[in-house]
């Protein structure tokens, strides 16, 4: 006798040469549906992984993930909340001298952000590729390095001078002057090919303190860089830094990230609906099978086969479709990802030619396969349970 008997009978029910064409078509469609769902989930999840990594690398690496400051954005260094260093997600912290300003050239005017730097906080701008010219930002010379796109907008070149203007926190009662301004010399440009090229100006830290009327023991705040900025827990950090103000990267780029998350959830919803259709096909197959195999089930029961083993026949029968579909879908998705020319061609039909970042994470593939298989197994329980509710004496009495 074939053992295990439940597996042998289930596979015979799944596919044999005597199956009607209608059943074969439904079985094939169910396998195709689950294959498409699995392949789509793996491909889309991999693209989302790549997009998030690209977002983190090209955008979040050029802005601080957190800024700790106070209401006036001018705070003593000794007020630094040292408890924040205990958090595991902290990668780097440095003090910050920064101010939003107006920058004026002979030809144009624009808004910008000035940042004071020296060797102690060079890490914050290591992506700017200006280490070789950093030494030229000597204190007292009032030299600056500006983004190429900002220079293009202002129509200025190396050696030209810019007037930097900012709103002072204090107002002179007699003169009424509330703006402070100073002329700086451009000694170089930086180009990151990112958004910061349009608005950032770098200057020596001591010069920035003098320009902004800060004492040496004062800073604008502290820049915090996280190991994983996408898993930021703002509430936890707010408790530690209270009563100081906490500005996180979501205030600047949060809308873009929210849009990405909404798109991800919508895609998963559509794919879940595709999976639901495939699972309903499996339920239909099982229901038809239990009706057709009533006599066979009754005979197996009279022969002493346990109800749990009869249920197992139908569970294996239904879940086999999911397992085959998962294997095919995984192989198809990995083939398309590895040989991504077809995938890029297909995407570029709907979107202008662009580079699609793809990152495959093995545990996600495993999770997708397990989840789909579990959904399928759960969908087989009710038809399998109904199959063993039939009384053999009643069914066989008509034979």
Curated annotation (Swiss-Prot):
Biological processes, Gene Ontology terms: lipoprotein localization to outer membrane; lipoprotein transport
> Cell membrane among the record's keywords?
yes
The entry's localization annotation reads: Cell membrane
Transmembrane stretches, start-end: 25-45, 266-286, 312-332, 358-378
GO cellular component terms listed in the entry, alphabetical order: plasma membrane protein complex
Give the domain of life.
Bacteria
> Which Pfam families does the entry mention?
FtsX, MacB_PCD
Identify its membrane topology class: Multi-pass membrane protein
Which terms are listed as keywords in the entry?
Answer: Cell membrane, Membrane, Transmembrane, Transmembrane helix, Transport
What is the purpose of this protein?
Answer: Part of an ATP-dependent transport system responsible for the release of lipoproteins targeted to the outer membrane from the inner membrane. Such a release is dependent of the sorting-signal (absence of an Asp at position 2 of the mature lipoprotein) and of LolA.
Protein family: Belongs to the ABC-4 integral membrane protein family. LolC/E subfamily.
Query: Which protein, by its recorded name, is this?
Result: Lipoprotein-releasing system transmembrane protein LolC
Lineage of the species this protein comes from: Bacteria, Pseudomonadati, Pseudomonadota, Gammaproteobacteria, Enterobacterales
